[in-house]
């Protein structure tokens, strides 16, 4: 049994986070081709009996496209207006595509405040449990339309790790526009080497994770490493992989060397 098979076997609860750069064209308009491939893979996993939670960015990006804005809004009210419009566009798209496979989705919008007290945490957990028990695929996003800066998660990488911990997931997959974690920035160093497995999120690993997010997103590699820290500390395996690859999710669960695997603690 190889390392991947050891840590990626028997996945019953899976959280998949998809970033804005994977879901949208550079213009901000939704990339239906990519979304369809992601939906198909999730629908197939659902049919295998795996309980999948999708953490989806893209609300602001979809709003930018719908409102025909030339660039990402800079002020908080403008961002929130774009998110309010875009979240509806995003959910309508998911609802329509999953319905083609006979599957139902439910929306959960979370803020950091929702996880600030035990009572509210239990309430969120109960909502997830009820949806999953009814065979519904929860689609999660931060409530960008109303949340204030002081209580923002700020990126869905961190949010997805918190959700994975909350529902006691076996695996967290972060789909981005990069193949995984490199030993140096591949945009600067053409000889950068993709790291297959990370046994511990230490200072050396954090140093490899410099760099900003994409134009339409908020999370760079540093936020993904923070997500890995949260996930692995809670006994959850995590993989960073490229959402551009059509079968990335399937490849990961087939133990192929897709992306970078982060080994969980105490498992």
Swiss-Prot record:
It is an enzyme of class 2 (transferase). Gene3D superfamilies: Acetylglutamate kinase-like (3.40.1160.10). Pfam families: AA_kinase. Keywords: Amino-acid biosynthesis, ATP-binding, Cytoplasm, Kinase, Nucleotide-binding, Proline biosynthesis, Transferase. One of its GO terms (molecular function) is glutamate 5-kinase activity. Coiled coil: none annotated. Substrate binds at residues 57, 144, 156. Its EC number is 2.7.2.11. ATP binds at residues 17, 176-177, 218-224. Pathway: Amino-acid biosynthesis; L-proline biosynthesis; L-glutamate 5-semialdehyde from L-glutamate: step 1/2. PANTHER family: GLUTAMATE 5-KINASE, ISOPENTENYL PHOSPHATE KINASE. Belongs to the glutamate 5-kinase family. Catalyzes the transfer of a phosphate group to glutamate to form L-glutamate 5-phosphate. This is Glutamate 5-kinase. It comes from Clostridium acetobutylicum (strain ATCC 824 / DSM 792 / JCM 1419 / IAM 19013 / LMG 5710 / NBRC 13948 / NRRL B-527 / VKM B-1787 / 2291 / W).
């Amino acid at each position: 049994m190889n390392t991947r098979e050891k840590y990626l076997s028997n996945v019953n609860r899976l959280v998949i986070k998809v970033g804005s750069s994977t879901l949208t064209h550079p213009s901000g308009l939704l990339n239906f081709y990519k979304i369809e491939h992601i939906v198909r893979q999730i629908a197939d996993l659902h049919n295998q009996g795996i309980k999948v939670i999708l953490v989806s960015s893209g609300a602001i990006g979809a709003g930018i496209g719908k409102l025909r804005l030339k660039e990402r809004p800079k002020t908080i009210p403008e961002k929130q207006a774009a998110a309010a419009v875009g979240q509806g566009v995003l959910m309508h798209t998911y609802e329509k595509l999953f319905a083609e496979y006979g599957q139902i989705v439910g929306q959960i919008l979370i803020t950091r405040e929702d996880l600030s007290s035990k009572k509210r945490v239990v309430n969120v957990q109960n909502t997830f449990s009820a949806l999953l028990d009814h065979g519904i695929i929860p689609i999660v996003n931060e409530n960008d339309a109303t949340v204030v800066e002081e209580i923002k998660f700020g990126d869905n990488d961190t949010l997805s790790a918190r959700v994975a911990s909350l529902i006691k997931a076996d695996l967290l997959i972060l789909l981005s526009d990069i193949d995984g974690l490199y030993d140096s920035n591949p945009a600067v160093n053409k000889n950068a080497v993709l790291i297959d497995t990370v046994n511990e999120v230490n200072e050396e690993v954090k140093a490899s994770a410099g760099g900003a997010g994409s134009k339409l997103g908020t999370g760079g590699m540093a936020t993904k490493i923070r997500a890995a820290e949260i996930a692995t500390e809670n006994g959850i395996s995590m993989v960073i992989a490229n959402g551009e690859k059509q079968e990335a999710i399937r490849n990961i669960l087939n133990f192929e060397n897709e992306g970078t695997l982060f080994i969980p603690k105490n498992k």
